[in-house]
Amino acid sequence: MLLILLSVALLAFSSAQDLDEDVSQEDVPLVISDGGDSEQFIDEERQGPPLGGQQSQPSAGDGNQNDGPQQGPPQQGGQQQQGPPPPQGKPQGPPQQGGHPPPPQGRPQGPPQQGGHPRPPRGRPQGPPQQGGHQQGPPPPPPGKPQGPPPQGGRPQGPPQGQSPQ
């Protein structure tokens, strides 16, 4: 069971990462929206290459030396954008992992029920009371039944009825 769960978890996690990477490329503006400055630089990159990629790169490098090289090649920018998604993927991972622990929690609950720990205690208490009840219950009815008919006059009625058919 554990192997199956682990394999399923790995498959789900890997597929989630693949989806995150695909989504990260599509959601580039959303990821970049975290920083207003980065949006402006990216806009410059987008506008710059069509006008003249060489001119836009030096200007971007002059504006921000750190961001300049990263902005120059759009591929590197893509890697940076992919960087934030992995953190997003990580938070998504724990929820999935968190989902797996509940099933184990359900399993421990199951074994006690299957183990019958609750059942034997239930059966044991029920056993003695039932036995005691049977012992106490049956004795009163038998004495009550024989005692009941005689006072009613069943004896006098019985003999005449028995004699008449004979």
Swiss-Prot record:
Q: Where is the signal peptide?
A: 1-16
> Might you report a single GO cellular component term?
extracellular space
User: What sections of the protein cross the membrane?
Assistant: none
Quick one: effect of changing residue 24 to A?
Decreased phosphorylation by FAM20C
Disulfide pattern? none
The PTM Pyrrolidone carboxylic acid maps to 17
Q: Which InterPro entries match?
A: Pro-rich
Residues annotated as region Disordered? 16-166
Q: Which Pfam families match?
A: Pro-rich
Q: Where is the composition biased (Pro residues)?
A: 83-111, 137-159
Which stretches are tagged as biased composition: Low complexity?
Answer: 48-61, 68-82
Per the UniProt annotation, where are the glycans attached?
33, 38
- Region: Inhibits hydroxyapatite formation, binds to hydroxyapatite and calcium; residue ranges are 17-46
Q: What is the recorded phenotype of mutating residue 163 to K? A: In allele PRH2-3
Keywords linked to the UniProt accession? Cleavage on pair of basic residues, Glycoprotein, Phosphoprotein, Pyrrolidone carboxylic acid, Repeat, Secreted, Signal
Protein name as catalogued? Salivary acidic proline-rich phosphoprotein 1/2
* Source species: Homo sapiens (Human)
- Whichever gene encodes this chain, its name is PRH1
